[in-house]
UniProtKB/Swiss-Prot annotation:
Bilayer-crossing regions: none
Positions with a binding annotation for NAD(+): 11-13, 32, 68
Top EC class for this record: oxidoreductase
Pathway this chain belongs to: Carbohydrate metabolism
Chain's role: Involved in catabolism of D-apiose. Catalyzes the conversion of D-apionate to 3-oxo-isoapionate.
Positions that bind Zn(2+): 113, 183
Protein encoded by which gene: apnO
Protein name, as recorded: D-apionate oxidoisomerase
Origin species: Rhizobium rhizogenes (strain K84 / ATCC BAA-868)
Organism phylogeny: Bacteria, Pseudomonadati, Pseudomonadota, Alphaproteobacteria, Hyphomicrobiales
Enzyme Commission number, as recorded: 1.1.1.421
GO MF annotations in UniProt: metal ion binding; NADP binding; oxidoreductase activity
Length: 275
């Protein structure tokens, strides 16, 4: 049985992982510094936490379910206690991309992150429909990267990833650099920003007299059908009027050089701001 040391087990993300790992084939040792986190694990999942040294004794995998800003400090504090060949799993590309993982060639570094349940899905159960984050009831895709270590280690990392993010559909293999392009680049800098703009546009319509429920229903409904056409979920085309609105709308809303947010230096700067 593979031994996993789960750091940050009582935190927001760590708790999700602890819940999904419970009952799996993995022997999990839980590490949590906060009393509230320890109590939550004990009261909700009947899981006890252990000291760091006990958790690391014989551990083949260490999962760092801690904030991006803490990964470097936590990893530096345990790196000398890890035996050669130990796999260190990070749940986001930011800290690994920024170079916050210790330089030690005999360790394996594996990075994995959920895509979250897609807007277009086949969920019929209401609990799954309401599981927008994923990892509980709704199926989701995932991305993973073997940052360093033997190629043979990828299979174990992916197996763990499929457990902690379950239920999983497609599992995509990417590089750490590609994962950083996806987040923060695609998902946060672009998608989240444009969604905020859409919400602000809705609020502007409300401020100009449109009933709020009408504006919200109209926007979300159109996001559904427009998104289905744009992302090829349906075989459809936009009307001439819609295409003309897009032709004039993009230049009015977007800078000509907006794709520069995907340049390596911009991705690095974005990650530097959050780590």
């Amino acid at each position: 049985m593979t031994v996993i040391a789960l750091f940050g087990a009582g935190g927001k993300m760590g708790y999700r992982l602890a819940k999904n790992l419970k009952g799996s084939r993995f022997d999990v040792r839980h590490v949590e510094v906060s009393d509230a986190g320890k109590a939550r694990l004990k009261n909700d999942l009947d899981l006890s936490c252990v000291p760091v040294d006990e958790a690391l004794n014989g551990a083949e995998v260490v999962i760092l379910a801690v904030p991006d800003t803490a990964i470097g400090k936590v990893a530096a504090g345990i790196v000398d206690k890890l035996k050669p060949g130990t796999m260190v799993v990070a749940l986001d590309a930011a800290a690994p991309f920024a170079g916050h993982l210790p330089k030690r060639d005999e360790l394996t570094y594996f990075v994995t992150h959920p895509c979250h349940p897609p807007i277009f899905n086949d969920e019929t159960d209401m609990q799954a429909k309401k599981d927008h984050f994923g990892g509980l009831f709704a199926k989701q895709h995932i991305v993973s990267a073997l940052m360093q270590g033997p190629e043979s280690a990828y299979a174990l990392g992916e197996e763990i990833a499929k457990v902690i993010w379950a239920p999983v559909m497609r599992s995509h293999r990417v590089t750490v650099e590609q994962m950083a392009m996806l987040e923060p680049g695609l998902s946060e800098t672009v998608c989240a920003s444009l969604l905020v703009v859409m919400r602000q546009a809705m609020d502007e319509c409300v401020a100009r007299g449109v009933p709020e429920d009408a504006a919200r229903d109209f926007l979300l409904g159109h996001m559904n059908v427009l998104g289905a056409v744009i992302f090829k979920e349906v075989d459809g085309v936009f009307s001439d009027a819609c295409n003309k609105a897009i032709e004039f709308g993009i230049p009015a809303l977007m800078r000509d050089d907006w794709k520069n947010v995907f340049e390596p230096k911009e991705i690095a700067a974005s990650i530097q701001r959050i780590t």
